[in-house]
Curated annotation (Swiss-Prot):
Lanthionine (Ser-Cys), cross-linked positions: 67-70
Cystine pairs: none
Listed InterPro entries: CHP03798_Ocin (IPR022516), Nif11 (IPR012903)
Name of the protein: Lantipeptide prochlorosin 4.3
Length: 77
């Protein structure tokens, strides 16, 4: 299971503005970006993580609380 890899990648993204910029690019391939950064995650891992977002995380992604950046759901805004 790649859950640990996904969590590690999310932590890396939160600390690395270069990765954040890559993920913000239109059509960004999150799986490929993660692989290039040394992580093994799948599209299924991402989809599963997105389905398990809390209401607060969803509100943040929708622009309700955050002012910009990448959050733990792998959405950049």
């Amino acid at each position: 299971m790649s859950e640990e890899q996904l969590k590690a990648f999310i932590a890396k993204v939160q600390a690395d503005t270069s990765l954040q910029e890559q993920l913000k690019a239109e059509g960004a391939d999150v799986v490929a970006i993660a692989k290039a950064a040394g992580f093994t995650i799948t599209t299924e891992d991402l989809n599963s993580h997105r389905q398990n977002l809390t209401d607060d995380e969803l509100e943040g992604v929708a622009g309700g609380t955050a002012s910009g950046g990448c959050d733990t759901s792998m959405f950049c805004y």
